[in-house]
Amino acid sequence: MRPLAIIGPTGTGKSALALDVAERLGGEIGVEIVNADAMQLYRGMDIGTAKLPAAQRRGVPHHQLDVLDVTETASVARYQSEAARDIETIAARGAVPIIVGGSMMYVQALLDDWAFPATDPAVRARWEQRLVEVGVATLHGELGKVDPDAAASILPTDGRRIVRALEVVELTGQPFAASAPTIGAPRWDTAIIGLDWETSVLDERLAARTDSMFAEGLVAEVAGLLRHGLREGVTASRALGYAQVLADLDAGGDGSAAREPTFVGTRRYVRRQRSWFRRDHRVCWLDGGSPDNVDRTLRAWRAVS
C-alpha cells in the first residue's frame, strides 16, 4: 500500500488533517501514522512539541513517537532506517502509512532515501572543539560563509548539526546538501501533501499555540525534564521552546519571559521550512483553512495509487 505524506510548516494543522484522513479511510482500509517531527521522538517532550496525547489520536496507531530519552542524540540516519522499516511493515500488512511532520531533513531523508556521507572522527572532533571555543552562534555564521543553504536549513542553536554540516563540507569539498538526492520520484511512490496558511493567519496561529503551550505547563515540563538530563541532551535541549525556557531559568527567571523568544524563534523556523519545502515540485499544496482538504488529500493519494 503506497504511503501518504502530510508535510509543511509548524502550526498548520498537519496532525489534525492526518487524523481526519485516517478516519475517512478507516471504513475501507487500515491506516497508521509515522511521525516525521524530530522533537516528537523524545519521551516527555509533549507540550512544547504539540505532541498529540494518546487519548486524542482517535485510535489510530502512531509510530516514531516517544522512542528516545532526552539524553540521547537524535540522528537523521537512524530515523531514516527505523521509519522506513515502519512504513514497509505497515504497507506489508495492507494498511496505509501516513507520514506526518515538518522536520525538513527527516522528511527528505525518508522520502528520497538520502545516502549520508561518511564521517571522520578527527575532523568531527576539531569542529566540536571549535564549537566550544567560539560558541554556536559564531559557528553557525562560519557555516553560512561556506554553505549558505545549509545554514538556512539548520537552527542557529543546533550545534550538533552545524558541526556535522561543516564536517561534510570539509570532507567532500561540496555543500552539505550535495549529499542529498536529486528530487525525482518519491520513495514508495508516496503522495506528498503540503499544508500551509497565509502568513499573517499562520502568525496568529503560532502566537495562540505559543500562549497555549505556556498556559498548559511548558515551564513545568522543562523543569521535570531537567531531572531526567535535559540539559545534557545534545539535541533535545535545543528544541524550540525548551531552549528558551532553559535560558530564562538559567538567567534567574521563572520561565515566563521565554514566551516571546519562543514565538519569534518559531516564526523564523517556519520561514526556513517554507523555503525548504517549496523547492519540492512534487508537493501538492493545500490552504490550511480550506474546508475540503480531506477530499483533496484523498484525491491526490488515489491519483498516485
Curated annotation (Swiss-Prot):
EC number(s) from the headed UniProt entry: 2.5.1.75
User: Please, one GO biological process term?
Assistant: tRNA modification
UniProt keyword annotations, A-Z: ATP-binding, Magnesium, Nucleotide-binding, Transferase, tRNA processing
Q: Which reaction does it catalyse?
A: adenosine(37) in tRNA + dimethylallyl diphosphate = N(6)-dimethylallyladenosine(37) in tRNA + diphosphate
Q: Does the keyword Cell inner membrane apply?
A: no
- InterPro entries linked to this entry: Dimethylallyltransferase, IPT, P-loop_NTPase
State the superkingdom. Bacteria
What cofactor is needed? Mg(2+)
Query: What parts of the sequence cross the membrane?
Result: none
Kindly give the SUPFAM superfamilies that the UniProt entry links to this protein: P-loop containing nucleoside triphosphate hydrolases
Task: Locate the site labelled Interaction with substrate tRNA.
Answer: 103, 124
**Which residues are noted in the entry as ATP-binding?**
8-15
* Cited PANTHER family: TRNA DIMETHYLALLYLTRANSFERASE
Purpose of the protein: Catalyzes the transfer of a dimethylallyl group onto the adenine at position 37 in tRNAs that read codons beginning with uridine, leading to the formation of N6-(dimethylallyl)adenosine (i(6)A).
State the family it belongs to: Belongs to the IPP transferase family.
Subunit-level organization: Monomer.
Q: Name the chain's protein.
A: tRNA dimethylallyltransferase
